[in-house]
C-alpha cells in the first residue's frame, strides 16, 4: 500500500506522469529514519534533563525543609535570648537601685563623719576591757567624815576622773560612774559596820564637889574611885576616824579629869 501511495503521488523533479524510481524511495526512507533517530535522541536528552530537574527540585525541597527547621531552632534560641535579656535587664535595674541607695548611705555617712571630725568627738577604740578602771581609782581614798559629807565628795571625785581621763565615750563614763558608786556604797557599808561594832563614846563624868564639911582625906579617897571607874573604859581610836568632831574633845576631857 505504501508503495502504491508513493507511486501514485507525483515525485518532485520527476517528469509528470513518469515512473518513480526505487532509489528515491530508499533515500526518502533513510532520511525519515535519521529524523526519527534524532527525534528519539532528543526525547532521551529531554527525559534525562527532566530527571535532573526532578532531582534538583527534590534537593531544593530537602534544603528548604532543613532551612525551615534551622529557622525554627533559631527562633527558639532568639526567644530564650530575649527572655534572658529581660531577666538581665531587671537584675541590672535592681542593682542600679541598690547602688543608688548605697551611694546615698555613703553620702550620709560621709556627712556624719565630717560633723564628728569637725566636733572632735571621733575616737577609735581598738581594744577596751569592760572592767578597766583608771589607776587613780585604786588609790586609797580618805575615809569620809559622815554620811552628810559623802554627797559633795562624790561629784568631785567623778569630776577629777573625767578631767584626768578626758574620755568622750559614754560607755566608759558610765562604767566609771558605776564603779565609783559601788566603791562609795562599799565604803558606807564598811563605815556602818564599824560604827555598829564600836563601843559608844563615854560621856565625861565630873567628880562631885566637896562641901565645906568634908575633909581632904575624903576628897583623896573619892578621886581614886573615880579613876578606877575611868580606867576600864578603853580610849577611842582617833586614828581610824580622825575627822569626827566629838572624838578629840572627849579624849581631851578624859585626860584633864585623869590629871585632876
Curated annotation (Swiss-Prot):
Subcellular location field = Cytoplasm; Membrane, Caveola; Cytoplasm, Cytosol
What is recorded about the domains?
The leucine-zipper domain is essential for its localization in the caveolae and for its interaction with CAV1 and EPS15L1.
Acidic residues bias located where?
157-168
**Protein name per UniProt:** Caveolae-associated protein 3
Q: Which Pfam families match?
A: PTRF_SDPR
Where is it mostly found? cytoplasm
> So what does this one do?
Regulates the traffic and/or budding of caveolae. Plays a role in caveola formation in a tissue-specific manner. Required for the formation of caveolae in smooth muscle but not in the lung and heart endothelial cells. Regulates the equilibrium between cell surface-associated and cell surface-dissociated caveolae by promoting the rapid release of caveolae from the cell surface. Plays a role in the regulation of the circadian clock. Modulates the period length and phase of circadian gene expression and also regulates expression and interaction of the core clock components PER1/2 and CRY1/2.
- Bias (Pro residues) occurs at 201-210
Spell out which residues are annotated as carrying Phosphoserine. Answer: 62, 70, 162-163, 171
Q: Which GO terms describe its biological process?
A: circadian regulation of gene expression; cortical actin cytoskeleton organization; negative regulation of fermentation; negative regulation of phosphatidylinositol 3-kinase/protein kinase B signal transduction; positive regulation of ERK1 and ERK2 cascade
GO molecular function list: protein kinase C binding
Subunit note:
Component of the CAVIN complex composed of CAVIN1, CAVIN2, CAVIN3 and CAVIN4. Interacts with PRKCD and with phosphatidylserine. Phosphatidylserine may form a bridge between PKC and PKC-binding partners and stabilize the binding. Interacts with PER2. Interacts with CAVIN1 and EPS15L1. Interacts (via leucine-zipper domain) with CAV1 in a cholesterol-sensitive manner.
Similarity comment: Belongs to the CAVIN family.
Location of the region described as Leucine-zipper in the Swiss-Prot/TrEMBL record: 20-78
| PTM annotation, UniProt | In vitro, phosphorylated by PRKCD.
Task: Note the position of the cross-link Glycyl lysine isopeptide (Lys-Gly) (interchain with G-Cter in SUMO2).
Answer: 128
Q: Which UniProt keywords apply?
A: Biological rhythms, Cytoplasm, Isopeptide bond, Membrane, Phosphoprotein, Tumor suppressor, Ubl conjugation
Show the segment(s) annotated as Interaction with CAV1: 135-201
Q: Cite the residue spans of the region called Disordered.
A: 140-260
* GO cellular component labels: caveola; cytoplasm; cytosol; protein-containing complex
Q: Where is this region: Interaction with CAVIN1?
A: 1-84
Amino acid at each position: 500500500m505504501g508503495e502504491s501511495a508513493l507511486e501514485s503521488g507525483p515525485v518532485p523533479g520527476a517528469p509528470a506522469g513518469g515512473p518513480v524510481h526505487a532509489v528515491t524511495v530508499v533515500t526518502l526512507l533513510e532520511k525519515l529514519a535519521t529524523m526519527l533517530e534524532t527525534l528519539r535522541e532528543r526525547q532521551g536528552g529531554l527525559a534525562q534533563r527532566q530527571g535532573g530537574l526532578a532531582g534538583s527540585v527534590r534537593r531544593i525541597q530537602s534544603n528548604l525543609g532543613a532551612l525551615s527547621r534551622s529557622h525554627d531552632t533559631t527562633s527558639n534560641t532568639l526567644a530564650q535570648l530575649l527572655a534572658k535579656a529581660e531577666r538581665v535587664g531587671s537584675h541590672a535595674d535592681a542593682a542600679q537601685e541598690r547602688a543608688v541607695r548605697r551611694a546615698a548611705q555613703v553620702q550620709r555617712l560621709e556627712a556624719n563623719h565630717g560633723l564628728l571630725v569637725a566636733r572632735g568627738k571621733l575616737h577609735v577604740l581598738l581594744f577596751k576591757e569592760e572592767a578597766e578602771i583608771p589607776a587613780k581609782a585604786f588609790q586609797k581614798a580618805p575615809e569620809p567624815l559622815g554620811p552628810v559629807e559623802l554627797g559633795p565628795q562624790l561629784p568631785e571625785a567623778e569630776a577629777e576622773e573625767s578631767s584626768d581621763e578626758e574620755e568622750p565615750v559614754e560607755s566608759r563614763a558610765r562604767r566609771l560612774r558605776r564603779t565609783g558608786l559601788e566603791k562609795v556604797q562599799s565604803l558606807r557599808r564598811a563605815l556602818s559596820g564599824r560604827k555598829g561594832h564600836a563601843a559608844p563614846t563615854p560621856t565625861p563624868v565630873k567628880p562631885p564637889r566637896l562641901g565645906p564639911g568634908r575633909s581632904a582625906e575624903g576628897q583623896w579617897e573619892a578621886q581614886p574611885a573615880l579613876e578606877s571607874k575611868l580606867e576600864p573604859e578603853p580610849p577611842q581610836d582617833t586614828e581610824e576616824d580622825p575627822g569626827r568632831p566629838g572624838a578629840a574633845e572627849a579624849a581631851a576631857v578624859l585626860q584633864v579629869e585623869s590629871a585632876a
